[in-house]
A protein has these predicted regions:
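Conserved N-terminal beta1-alpha1 strand-loop-helix module at the mouth
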Residues: 1-171, 176-198
């Protein structure tokens, strides 16, 4: 986290238990890291929980200031989360598979994050796939959504500049594109931030 912040990260994603993908860490470690991150850097809990009760419980174990919901929820769950955690920001991940990718969730959260997973598989892909999706479609979503839109999905030091120019997102979310053999690669991370800030 400290290295990412030193390179210019404005948020740190802390990955809870997931059905697939790189980087999950124990809730106790998430809590420790979140407590060490200085303001104004945001701390995002990436959770695959699908009910308000479980999401609130996950947050209470970790104490981040933002929850990134990586799977689909029923609309009523958002209201229950907001009631229980009124000062916590909610970011809904939308896996871009077509023009209908952004649904009613955009109205119920503070921001959305466009990614390239596939939640319909037997073992759900909820992020960290290293695959790009259609950035022109992502641009349409940015233009029509009315909320801040983060871009994820296959971003790396070689393509981040193009992604920014094509999509014009509010922010970027990186994972597999700055890893080597499943571990965070500081050289790739530094190159990513250098390319993104050009």
């Amino acid at each position: 986290a400290a290295q990412a912040i030193s390179f210019g990260a404005s948020a740190i994603g802390l990955v809870g238990k997931m059905p697939s993908g790189p980087g999950p860490i124990a809730d106790e470690l998430i809590k420790t890291i979140a407590a060490s991150v200085p303001p104004p850097v945001a701390t995002f809990l990436l959770t695959s929980e699908q009910t308000a009760e479980n999401i609130v419980a996950h947050h209470e174990r970790t104490h981040t200031n933002t929850i990134q919901i990586v799977d689909e929820l029923l609309g009523r769950e958002y209201g229950a989360i907001r009631s229980a955690l009124p000062h916590v920001k909610l970011v809904q991940v939308i896996h871009v598979v077509g023009e209908s990718s952004v649904d009613e969730a955009a109205e119920l959260v503070d921001a959305i994050l466009l990614d390239s997973g596939n939640p319909t598989l037997a073992v759900k892909e909820l992020g960290g796939t290293g695959r790009r999706h259609d950035w022109k479609l992502s641009r349409k979503i940015v233009e029509t959504c009315g909320k801040p839109v983060f871009l994820a999905g296959g971003l790396n030091p070689e393509n981040v500049r193009e992604a920014i120019e094509v999509v014009q997102p509010f922010g970027l979310d990186i994972c597999s594109g700055v890893r080597t053999d499943g571990n965070l690669d500081m050289f790739k991370l530094e190159r990513f931030f250098a390319a993104a800030s050009r």
